[in-house]
């Protein structure tokens, strides 16, 4: 039974960050309270009806490898699955799925309700309770105190949220939900650096008024991909297509004529928006020579009448939105059933956080999701999982954990945020990861599941399946190395005839698989192949490890060199003013950021190689003193 006032961890907000945070802490055995304005909105897909995409899918796979629920939820609710960048190398291939919004929410709700150690309550938090520079609980609007050892703030766009449609604006966390004004005001009274960001969403269109004839159709890939390492194609609901249309000169002219009604271009809206998901107004202004822009028509569900026109996010007045929609092929007679809008909200400087996502200023207070300056469900969920597990560790007085840049995209994300900060909504891309060949979708479990097991995040069924996959990979890779093909065998004739490979000496199956034109299924047609494996995940892993072995080895060597700096810690330095030779600018930045290692210090903007050399010399001198 719960003591209804005392918990180990309290999570404020039940979006993608909050739900993953609550799941992580409760799985680790902590009594967890999840507070939300509406239980009916648990894990809601507030904007686009999709999970994954370039770089984002890698985060989803990592969440799954650590026992999180996002991948499972989309497997049970995804109505169209595709592999992006399928013609490119495995490092940048990314899974993306359209979601049935209702099914997704219901799946998340079902998972949460089955979770032990978790209590979900409807309540709005208006204040935090502090004691000796530590957070010890929260106060709700109805004047109830809840106490805990740590608190995770995952409030999304609700802190000081303000919706803009044309030149009109009003307070809201998202359309139909009120903003968390009191908590926003209270947090601004603390010593936290806070600023404003904005994001936007397109109008929703009645599917019954769309003319899909003559539009480009996009079906699911065949075979249909699966997100979770525990997933199966049989988990997917019915698959339906999306459609592609375009804006045109008429659309662009309508927008140009009405820019004086845009809150973005009239100065009403100050917050910066996401660079990689701009409004249609931004596209027209920034790319005046473009004749058209893509618009993907994405159904919001199998039983929903809403269509999400991906590509025309806007905050123009509703009457202008109607003109824009009517100018687009296939939407000439369409009806808008919910207007597009921009929303402005508070975010807190992530440079004020440790790599565990705990505040440097307030012990036990963790931040996750959009309030850290990120955009996207996947970025939020991955932060939520990390904040939740570290809140749990903090409540047990145990040292926190975070992945390095060479271990996970999540490591890249938190290092970028806490080291460099952000002035615009941060979105994950594969290009942000310098070790992306080692951080593929297919090996997320091999990178993280053992760590998740030690942390208490991974259950027995996942652990058993993971170990079976590892065994399959090791056994088959050894078999392929031992299995040889003679240049005078029938298989050699097949290789010459079908693949133009002329064997002049005996070759192993493993060496043969290194050839770019040979796939694992090609080996299966050879007489000497004998019996292989049927585990498709293991097969994909084997192919990638063998084909890219040389590149992976070089990257591993680079990572080893990089780890020397990451493992050279700066915790012994309390005041950088005392180190001779550092410029005042460098001293200020180092004192402000308080990097944990030479590696992190080197990634701070303005920290020069010369400054790094001075720090290394200082550490060497201090080490020498201690040996005397």
From Swiss-Prot:
Which GO MF terms are attached to this record? Answer: flavin adenine dinucleotide binding
Cofactor requirements of the protein? FAD
Gene Ontology cellular-component terms for this entry are: cytosol
Q: Can the keyword Signal be found in this entry's annotation?
A: no
Say if the entry is tagged with keyword Flavoprotein.
yes
Compartments reported by the entry: Cytoplasm
Q: Which BP terms in the Gene Ontology apply to this protein? A: tRNA methylation; tRNA wobble uridine modification
Q: Which family does it belong to?
A: Belongs to the MnmG family.
Q: What is this protein called?
A: tRNA uridine 5-carboxymethylaminomethyl modification enzyme MnmG
Organism, per UniProt?
Answer: Buchnera aphidicola subsp. Acyrthosiphon pisum (strain Tuc7)
